[in-house]
């Protein structure tokens, strides 16, 4: 699942450098991998993991300079201070925090905010709601990021047309909308066939970034003095008010850093780290320092420095390559949104969603129509509403900084509860990360009126939806449980007054195997019959991403008529009840689909003043329940073998 293979690797046998030292620290506990497999995984990581942070140079340095300018004037110390801040931010946040620490906090090979939440909740007794709330906030912020990334990325690339052909400026927004609508429209076809070129295109993009930056560093080689943290510290202290605003813009250079952890399960830690240390990080630095040197020698170039430093003969190819890179970055975010949505459904944070598999060979290739539609609409609305990437920049940082802040808080619990670090060892590290995270978060939160409201608004709506679903399902479970009859009592009553026995097997789905399922009660009440064999089936989602087939099913014979079956799936796995029940043959149950009927209860919910939730939340929960995907489709049960029994419940 982690995408890692065992073997030997000679690619790291180079002279001792900062990269090799960091890599050695990151992989101190891992064996070597096959060289060819490693190259393939590194190339794949370039196409999926680094699209977002890799396209940041298009707009990040420009926005930071605009924030740093005093009355529209930039001093040499301002330019050196900004590029120094970018260098040290990338070093401390991405290279130190994520590479050396966060990537180690995997949940059975999987990463991402919900995986981290599940890992922490499993480690803490009682599975506290506080951690669940933190995870929900992190997931909501991720979706906010997923809305803004395609909008700002593609829009910033298309703004290159303003340099190539100024007369095409009015077409920047329409062209961006066309590209994004096309991108979201083709999602249902799957990306398996075209994804193979994502890696090579992004590799070419990073080469172009590095080459263009290196070329212009020679315009003013003294720009390399900004590697000294003195320039960053001086910039922060000379004019704190200006520096504080600038820090918020500097953070744009790190948007996408959370993808290193989110995509951990797709490639494994080693390919992600090697791609960063040996390709992405050096090329990003070369480009940022190249932009700084170009502006130092061409003071008027601060409007769109990324494209202005490209030679005229290479402008069109660069605009096209930038557009391709931003589309790939957007695709990676969209795919990530599908993955997080599926995890949220499995962890019961969101209602069931229709999930379509777009590839027979690649299990991870999924398409969620409802997520795609809502995400696409939100992205297009943002582009039409903000019109310029500089306007969207204010909205971008809040979601990502918030997500990083949540990650740091959960990382502390992992360090102390799972890695068993002493508080005296973990706390100084976490406090250092928190200081940096809080600085970036506070510098971005002040931009609420400039566009940050969009990010906060999206996250707030999603938090309300997810918390309402969690709270509503708990209230519903407690209410129905009070009305249910213990299975022991029903079996005892049937022993005294046996119902009519009919041939075949009946499978009753329930969330509580100790209580008689509602469908069973209604079947006995209205039809007065009991099947020859009855299975009380419970589907459980584990706190880990994957559960092996050998551990999928547990059987226990209750009596001659009843059997209890529990199916366990990881939160990254799509439940397939039919296939899972087939595994029960090895455990002694001769499962035959042709003689089996599945009984499901479909609840009709009505709001109640005694639900324990506000009326508006009752109505929202009922709406979410009505829009939930059908259980038959979600659990992949043959429709011809399903009997649904309706019940009305007041919540």
Swiss-Prot record:
Any one GO MF annotation of this record: potassium ion transmembrane transporter activity
Recorded catalytic reaction(s): these are:
K(+)(in) + H(+)(in) = K(+)(out) + H(+)(out)
Q: Which family does it belong to?
A: Belongs to the HAK/KUP transporter (TC 2.A.72) family.
Topology in the lipid bilayer is annotated as: Multi-pass membrane protein
What is this protein's record name? Probable potassium transport system protein Kup
This protein's species is Brucella suis (strain ATCC 23445 / NCTC 10510)
Transmembrane regions: 41-61, 82-102, 130-150, 163-183, 194-214, 235-255, 276-296, 309-329, 366-386, 395-415, 426-446, 450-470
Subcellular location as annotated: Cell inner membrane
* One CC-aspect GO term: plasma membrane
Physiological role: Transport of potassium into the cell. Likely operates as a K(+):H(+) symporter.
Query: What Pfam families is this protein classified in?
Result: K_trans, K_trans_C
Q: Which HAMAP family match?
A: Kup
The alphabetized UniProt keywords are:
Cell inner membrane, Cell membrane, Ion transport, Membrane, Potassium, Potassium transport, Symport, Transmembrane, Transmembrane helix, Transport
